């Protein structure tokens, strides 16, 4: 079999191995979806990822306005109607702080981080109520100080609200259309009155995976601490953070002009509605948030998916090694033997995924790679007609697996490490074949086959 034809055959075998590799990659995606479903199930049973917004001071009012309406006869008439609306005021300063106590919930094979945030939300308001408008017959309603949370099932115990040092009763709902949360009713102010208050809410809020805050104050200070050692900060980066094996502490200092949260909140509120219906600011809009995700630094499915991206490289390198043995040592290797070794390399990724669901990823990687190296080394001892050659090939394969593990755990340096690995492999092939006369070798192989 001529060298050129054998090279084409090796390339075809490599392409065929891509089929089972793609099947393994699809399996990884399927297992990820199962994991996501488990996370959603725990969120439904426990509490969803939480986003906290507020407090927001809402002062409703009604007034008489002149509206232009077209009658059935096509004539435009001016009609005077009562119209409901509201003024919305944000804190001049908002402080949210507390500790995030974490735990792990299990759903089948999957573990999901959950938490309970024991926190305090302090806010200062200093607003001016608009004065009367001549002829409007304006009537100011009961002001509402509202706090929003994504999932009220996460509220543990009874939250306590103090306004100007006095405890105030909390009611269900955030005080605006369908918003989940809590609110307090305040005394009705006079038109043109100066309205100032200091509020402090103490609560315990449970959730899964992440907690975030909407910076609605003119000045916002958010401080979080936890024993979770692997936080992933979302939104704007904290201006100060400390992360160690024992946990993290982070603080954000953000002005409203840096987030545009106030404008986005107002843009989604119902305006000048007489029915009280309209979009929910808490549910229908994605407001800017600051917070933390309780991340898993070693996501087995993500690492396995990245590993399969290198699968074709592994197969190609192994087949190149086979080819070198075949042409240099004059050892005929059948295409079926190429295929069996290629399938063994694919089985490594399948073992990696399945084992990592039960044991830590490093242990799963060591077990899967060790099993495949042992199997391939044992098989090649017969194929290459030497136990030493089989052991040497297995040792080389072990170095490749070690290099792959380094690529997986060092994502930031994956490109440079991968480039160096490819350079080293190419250099090894060039050095090993630097004195080969490929024309003469091809003729020798052809004559040997003929004889």
Can you annotate each of these PLM segments?
Residues 24-49:
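Alpha-helical transmembrane signal-anchor/signal-peptide segments
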């Amino acid at each position: 079999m001529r060298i050129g034809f054998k090279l084409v055959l090796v390339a075809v075998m490599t392409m065929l191995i891509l089929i089972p590799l793609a099947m393994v990659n699809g399996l990884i995606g399927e297992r990820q979806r199962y994991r996501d479903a488990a996370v959603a199930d725990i969120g439904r049973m426990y509490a969803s990822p939480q986003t906290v917004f507020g407090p927001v001071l809402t002062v409703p009012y009604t007034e008489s306005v002149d509206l232009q309406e077209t009658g059935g006869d096509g004539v435009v008439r001016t009609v005077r109607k009562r119209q409901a609306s509201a003024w919305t005021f944000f804190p001049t300063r908002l402080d949210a702080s507390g500790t995030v106590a974490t735990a792990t919930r299990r759903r089948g094979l999957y573990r999901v981080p959950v938490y309970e945030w024991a926190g305090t939300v302090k806010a200062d308001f200093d607003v001016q109520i608009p004065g009367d408008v001549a002829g409007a017959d304006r009537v100011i309603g009961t002001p509402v100080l509202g706090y929003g949370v994504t999932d009220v099932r996460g509220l543990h115990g009874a939250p306590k609200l103090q306004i100007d040092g006095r405890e105030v009763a909390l009611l269900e709902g955030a005080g605006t259309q369908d918003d989940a949360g809590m609110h307090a009713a305040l005394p009705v102010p006079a038109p043109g009155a100066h309205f100032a208050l200091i509020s402090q809410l103490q609560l315990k809020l449970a959730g899964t995976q992440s907690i975030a805050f909407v910076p609605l104050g003119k000045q916002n200070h958010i401080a979080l601490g936890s024993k979770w050692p692997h936080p992933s900060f979302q939104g704007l980066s904290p201006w100060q953070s400390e992360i160690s094996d024992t946990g993290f502490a982070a603080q954000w200092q953000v002005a409203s002009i840096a987030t545009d949260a106030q404008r986005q909140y107002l843009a989604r509120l119902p305006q000048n509605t007489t029915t009280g219906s309209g979009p929910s600011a808490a549910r229908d809009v994605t407001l800017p948030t600051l917070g933390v995700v309780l991340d898993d630094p070693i996501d087995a499915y993500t690492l396995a998916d990245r590993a399969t991206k290198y699968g074709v490289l592994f197969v190609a390198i192994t087949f190149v090694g086979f080819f070198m043995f075949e042409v240099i040592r004059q050892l005929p290797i059948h295409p079926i033997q190429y295929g069996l070794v290629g399938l063994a390399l694919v089985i490594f990724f399948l073992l990696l995924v399945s084992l990592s669901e039960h044991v830590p990823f490093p242990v799963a990687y060591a077990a899967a790679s060790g099993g495949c190296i042992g199997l391939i080394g044992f098989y090649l001892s017969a194929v290459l007609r030497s136990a030493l050659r089989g052991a040497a090939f297995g040792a080389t394969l072990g170095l490749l697996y070690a290099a792959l593990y380094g690529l997986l755990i060092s994502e930031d340096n994956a490109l440079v490490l991968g480039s160096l690995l490819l350079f080293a492999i190419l250099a090894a092939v060039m050095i090993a074949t630097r004195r080969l006369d490929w024309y003469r070798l091809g003729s020798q192989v052809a004559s040997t086959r003929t004889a």
